Amino acid sequence: MSKILCIDYGKKRIGLSITNSIRSIAFGLDTVNSNNIICTLYKYLKYEDIDTIVIGLPIRFDNSLFPIEKDIKKFIKIINNKYPKLIIKRIDERFTSKIANYYLINTRLKINQLKKNQNFLDKDKISATILLQEYIKY
């Protein structure tokens, strides 16, 4: 079975996550500068068996869309043109950043107590992982 890649799109940074081959678990993959996303996407699509990309849908509490949705739509158009066989799915991303921040706060406290490396603590990658885990749950 092919894997699913998830994108948490931001103006400056983009978080990426990926499922295992049986699509049961989401793993944080990377955080990239938004200027490098096409090259990074190409790299993962070349070396991983991915047939679906899940992209967060930035919805406000009143159900209107955040302005960044215009950039996301342009990005999706680029993906569709370059990779027409890829399936693109959207998922409501409300609360994922808050959940990621909560996770980071709690994890940093524990890590600081243990004096370990904090490089793996990345809100964008964690947000993408939360989004993807929500997607594969259903």
Curated annotation (Swiss-Prot):
<dbReference type="InterPro" id="IPR006641">
    <property type="entry name" value="YqgF/RNaseH-like_dom"/>
</dbReference>
<keyword id="KW-0690">Ribosome biogenesis</keyword>
<dbReference type="GO" id="GO:0005829">
    <property type="term" value="C:cytosol"/>
</dbReference>
<comment type="similarity">
    <text>Belongs to the YqgF nuclease family.</text>
</comment>
<keyword id="KW-0540">Nuclease</keyword>
<dbReference type="InterPro" id="IPR037027">
    <property type="entry name" value="YqgF/RNaseH-like_dom_sf"/>
</dbReference>
<keyword id="KW-0963">Cytoplasm</keyword>
<keyword id="KW-0378">Hydrolase</keyword>
<dbReference type="GO" id="GO:0004518">
    <property type="term" value="F:nuclease activity"/>
</dbReference>
<dbReference type="GO" id="GO:0000967">
    <property type="term" value="P:rRNA 5'-end processing"/>
</dbReference>
<dbReference type="InterPro" id="IPR005227">
    <property type="entry name" value="YqgF"/>
</dbReference>
<dbReference type="InterPro" id="IPR012337">
    <property type="entry name" value="RNaseH-like_sf"/>
</dbReference>
<comment type="function">
    <text>Could be a nuclease involved in processing of the 5'-end of pre-16S rRNA.</text>
</comment>
<protein>
    <recommendedName>
        <fullName>Putative pre-16S rRNA nuclease</fullName>
        <ecNumber>3.1.-.-</ecNumber>
    </recommendedName>
</protein>
<dbReference type="Pfam" id="PF03652">
    <property type="entry name" value="RuvX"/>
</dbReference>
